[in-house]
Amino acid sequence: MSPAPTTSAGPASSGIPPSSLPTSTVTEDDTKPSSSSSKANDLLPRYLTNDPSRTGYDPSIQWWMNYFKILTGQITPEGVEHYREDRYKANEARDCARCEADRDWLFQNSPVIRFLREKVANLNGVLDETNVVCRRCPSRIVVIPGNKEKGEEDRIEVARQGGGFSPDHGILLCANEMRNRGHLEDTLAHEMVHAWDHLRWKVDWFGEKSLRHAACTEIRASMLSGECRWTRESIVRGNWTLTQQFQNCVRMRAIQSVMARPTCKDDVHATKVVNEVWDSCFSDKRPFEEIYR
C-alpha cells in the first residue's frame, strides 16, 4: 500500500540538569544552516554526544562494569541514556528477530490486528511483512534552547519513538522500544488506524494546509489502539486517576504528536488544534463500532 510519517511516541523528559551541559560537548545537526545565520542556529535542537569525563559512562569497558556503575550511582542520567543506546545497538539483531516473530503472531492471532488488516484490505490496501517492518530506532538527547530574553534555561529531552507510519513506505515498529508482545500490539494497532485513515480520507500528514487532519487521526489512533486503556496507564505509566483518565491520555498523546509536525508552532498551538477537532474525532470510532480495548 502507499501508507508522511507519524510517530507513536514523542520526546520524553530525561531529568538531566541543564547546568551539567558545557557547550563544548554539544553538537548540532549536520543539516543546520550556515554559521552566518546565528540567530536561526539558536533555535535548532542540539544533540549531545557522550563524554565519559562528564557522564561517567565509558563505552570502552565491559557492559557489566558500566551496569554496576549505574547501580552504584556513578553514571549520570545522561550517561544512562548513552549506555541504553549502545546496548540497543549490540542487541539489534535479537530485538528485530523477536519483533518480527511477535508481528507475525499478531497477524495470525490478534483479533484487533486481524480486524484492522481486513478493513485496510477492504480499502484496497495491503499490510504484511513487506511493509510492516521492525527496525532499531535510535534515540537522541536533545537540548531545547530556552528563551534567554525571558531568563529560560535550556531544556533537556530524550527523543524516542515506538513506531511510525508513512504513506510511501508503510509501518515502522521500533524493535528496541517494544517491551513485550502486548506493547507491540498496541503500537501496531495505532499505526494501522493511521493507515486506514489515510486510505479512507487521504490525510494531510504534514499539516501543509491544516493541522486538523493530523490532530484527528492521532486522537482516533490513541483512542482505538488500546494504548490509553486504564490498565496500561496505571500499571505501566503509574497514572492511577479514575476520572477522565482515558480522555486525558488520548488528548495528551494527540497533542504530543501534533507538536512533532513542522508547521506546529508550540504546545499551545497543538492544544488549540486538538481542541478544535476533539468532539467530532473522539466520537468517531470507525472502522470499529465501539472502543474494544
Swiss-Prot record:
InterPro entries in UniProt: Peptidase_M76_ATP23
Pfam families cross-referenced by the UniProt entry: Peptidase_M76
GO CC list: mitochondrial inner membrane
Major subcellular site: mitochondrion
Topology class, membrane: Peripheral membrane protein
Statement: the UniProt record of this protein carries the keyword tRNA-binding: no
Active site, UniProt feature: E191
Alphabetical UniProt keywords: Hydrolase, Membrane, Metal-binding, Metalloprotease, Mitochondrion, Mitochondrion inner membrane, Protease
Any GO BP annotation: mitochondrial proton-transporting ATP synthase complex assembly
Subcellular localization(s) per the UniProt record: Mitochondrion inner membrane
Binding site for a divalent metal cation: H190, H194
Coiled-coil stretches noted in the UniProt entry, renumbered to this chain: none
Region (Disordered): 1-51
Biased composition (Low complexity): 8-22
UniProt-listed PANTHER family: MITOCHONDRIAL INNER MEMBRANE PROTEASE, MITOCHONDRIAL INNER MEMBRANE PROTEASE ATP23 HOMOLOG
Family: Belongs to the peptidase M76 family.
Function text: Has a dual role in the assembly of mitochondrial ATPase. Acts as a protease that removes N-terminal residues of mitochondrial ATPase CF(0) subunit 6 at the intermembrane space side. Also involved in the correct assembly of the membrane-embedded ATPase CF(0) particle, probably mediating association of subunit 6 with the subunit 9 ring.
Name of the protein in its database record: Mitochondrial inner membrane protease atp23
